[in-house]
Amino acid sequence: GCSSGNTRPSEENAAEVPVYLDTNYSFRERAADLVSRMTLEEKVSQMCTDADSIPRLGVPAYRWWSECLHGIARNGNATVFPMPIGLAATFDDALVHEVADAISTEGRVLFEMARKRGNLSKYTGLTYYSPSINIFRDPRWGRGQETYGEDPFLTSTMGVAYVKGLQGDDPKYLKVAACAKHYAAYSGYSHDAKWFSNTTDVDMYQTYLPAFKALVKEADVESVMG
């Protein structure tokens, strides 16, 4: 399309419409303006899984926790795809991308349905704590089925495909927001936290970290869970 003149609002209009509500500004500018208007207590309230509403600024409450490791979880009826360990066994990253794309489409629909019912509860948002890209070496760990197995390269490849499928390819808007978890050497059998001390620097950099690096650099994953 064509544009003429400055698209920024006039000073008169700017006085009427806060920057954070003005779509002529970038997301970064709008977010910075919104945060600058918050009190310390309001900022802190946004840093939890259950973020409170800020009525005076028109900010609704939001529940960040949703899951979609192999389908939309806990938010009504949705397609259940094979567990990630099964998807990894196909060695087909194009298939994994297709699965993730279908999941995010359903996520969008379920999000809109929940909002129309006035449902703002947990598991109804567009921020998903998926995929799990931990390295599965020890079968005693009870969450191995959530991962893509023990190989760092395969985990990276599958994880990148999954994130791209979830988040979509629109240059401006996310379809949904993915979250790579759990950073970083999380996937070991242990009765306490001492297990982590057994991870060598070599193992950390060659085995546990490559998938996280790939998802950040190649897939622009929206967030990482510590």
Which residues fall in each region the model found?
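Glycoside hydrolase catalytic-domain context in secreted enzymes
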Residues: 2-226
